[in-house]
Amino acid sequence: AGGRAATARALAALGVSSDGLVQVDGSGLSRDNRISARQLSALVHAVLASGGESAALWRGSLALAGQTGTLEKRLVGTPSAGRVRAKTGFIGGTSSLSGIATSLDGRERVFAILVNYPDVDGLNNSCWKPMQDEIVRFLVERLP
């Protein structure tokens, strides 16, 4: 209960609504946790807008497409490589990618892509990565 209250206070301090947020555990591993893409994007934006050392440390902790962490093998050989910093997420039936995409003209765009899918044969996290990558490439390479 203390963790949920602390999360609600932190979100409120950043100006992010906690309406509809369901936090069952602090690790994010419960299938019953819930956050909307809008809330997640608002959180990313608020952390970046807060500036200072915390924002810089958080940004630096995110994987860099085509170079580091869970994004090391994604977007390789595309103009988007090195322009996307993001956090991946996966738990059975859910695949997510959220973070910051820097367009070719230098504009930063915050995004959150959350996919829920049925637990049936043949569907797994790797089915959704190409779609997530295409959305991010659109943000970097083609969105005016």
Regions inferred by a protein language model and the residue ranges of each:
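A small/polar active-site loop signature that marks catalytic segments
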Residues: A1-A56
